[in-house]
């Protein structure tokens, strides 16, 4: 059995530091790098690409809404054509840095509000999938299972990678609990590790609003903006490896 461990990175902007890139890169197997719209100034993106290269971490594009002030966590009413163009633009921007450093683009995973909107809005999901397909039909797209986002990615003929979140709470409907909801963040590293094991080995996890929810996980996400993200990533990886799960990029 194997699973990927991913984290968001490269989200600092100029003098404004964000996340724990240097601490978390040695612990994960893939990283989703900001592309300049929600975070990531050119110098910071290049820095993150070089860190990934040094640690053998697979690099994916992490396109978001054009919202630096809100860090891409505020939903925007963009047309499908605007979403398509924005995603294509951001993939291209990151690809320039990867080409300069001799690295391939490994996957695409939307950020924040764009990811969540794609999970429930079919037109947004389709626009993302078509942008990825237009850039490279062989690029994997990371999705939340059981959503219209997964459906549209499959319709586009893309390789779909199913994602789960050990440090985010789920609702019974399979969606992530809103960040504003008490208990939506799992901050204890050992609890996150326990949840990760259940997700990978049992295919389920407890829901915040009661009962359990089925989970399919080919990659597990650790949010880089979690205050103790390195500790969570370390605990999750150690627990998986001790259970005999191979942790490597998909």
From Swiss-Prot:
EC numbers, comma separated: 3.5.2.9
GO BP terms in the entry: carbohydrate metabolic process
Catalytic activity: 5-oxo-L-proline + ATP + 2 H2O = L-glutamate + ADP + phosphate + H(+)
Cysteine disulfide partners in this protein: none
Highest rank taxon of the organism: Bacteria
Record's keyword terms, sorted: ATP-binding, Hydrolase, Nucleotide-binding, Plasmid
Claim: Nucleus is one of the keywords in the record: no
MF terms (GO), sorted A to Z: 5-oxoprolinase (ATP-hydrolyzing) activity; ATP binding
Keyword ATP-binding: yes
Pfam family, one: LamB_YcsF
Signal peptide: none
InterPro entries according to UniProt: Glyco_hydro/deAcase_b/a-brl, LamB/YcsF/PxpA-like
Gene3D superfamilies with a match to the protein in the record: Glycoside hydrolase/deacetylase
Role noted for this protein: Catalyzes the cleavage of 5-oxoproline to form L-glutamate coupled to the hydrolysis of ATP to ADP and inorganic phosphate.
PANTHER family per UniProt: 5-OXOPROLINASE SUBUNIT A, UNCHARACTERIZED PROTEIN YBGL-RELATED
Record-stated family: Belongs to the LamB/PxpA family.
HAMAP family per UniProt: PxpA (MF_00691)
Assembly: Forms a complex composed of PxpA, PxpB and PxpC.
Name of the protein this chain belongs to: 5-oxoprolinase subunit A
Provenance organism: Thermus thermophilus (strain ATCC BAA-163 / DSM 7039 / HB27)
The encoding gene: pxpA
């Amino acid at each position: 059995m194997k699973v990927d461990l991913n984290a968001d990175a490269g989200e600092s902007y100029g003098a404004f530091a964000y996340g724990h890139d240097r601490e978390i890169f040695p612990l994960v197997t893939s990283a989703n790098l900001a592309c300049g719209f929600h975070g990531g100034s050119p110098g910071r993106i290049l820095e993150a690409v070089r860190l990934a290269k040094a640690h053998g971490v697979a690099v994916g594009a992490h396109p978001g809404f054009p919202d630096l002030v809100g860090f891409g966590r505020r939903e925007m009413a963009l047309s499908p054509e605007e979403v398509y163009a924005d995603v294509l633009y951001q993939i291209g921007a990151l690809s320039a840095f990867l080409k300069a450093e001799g690295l391939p683009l490994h996957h695409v995973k939307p950020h924040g509000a764009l990811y969540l909107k794609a999970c429930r809005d079919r037109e947004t999901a389709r626009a993302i999938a078509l942008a990825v397909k237009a850039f490279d039909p062989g690029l994997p797209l990371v999705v939340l299972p059981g959503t219209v986002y997964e459906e549209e990615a499959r319709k586009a003929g893309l390789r779909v990678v199913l994602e789960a979140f050990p440090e985010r709470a789920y609702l019974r409907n399979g969606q992530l609990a809103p960040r504003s909801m008490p208990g939506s963040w799992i901050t204890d590293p050992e609890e996150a590790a326990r949840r990760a094991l259940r997700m990978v080995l049992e295919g389920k996890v407890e829901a915040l609003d009661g009962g359990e929810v089925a989970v399919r996980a080919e990659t597990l996400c650790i949010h880089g903006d979690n205050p103790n993200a390195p500790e969570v990533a370390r605990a999750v990886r150690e627990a998986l490896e001790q259970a005999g799960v191979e942790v490597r990029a998909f």
